[in-house]
Amino acid sequence: DFKDWMKTAGEWLKKKGPGILKAAMAAAT
């Protein structure tokens, strides 16, 4: 289920830290 996957991804990002999220945002812009 996609929602479950998004929840898992969200938890993973929290554990890995905001650095990965910032990198993803930078790559998207």
Curated annotation (Swiss-Prot):
Role this protein plays: Has activity against some Gram-positive bacteria and S.cerevisiae. Has a non-hemolytic activity.
Main location: secreted
Keyword terms, alphabetized: Antibiotic, Antimicrobial, Fungicide, Secreted
Keyword Lipid metabolism set for record: no
Similarity section: Belongs to the ponericin-G family.
Signal peptide coordinates: none
GO cellular component term, pick one: extracellular region
Domain of life: Eukaryota
Tissue: Expressed by the venom gland.
Protein name: M-poneritoxin-Ng3d
GO aspect biological process, one term: defense response to fungus
InterPro entries: Poneritoxin
Compartments reported by the entry: Secreted
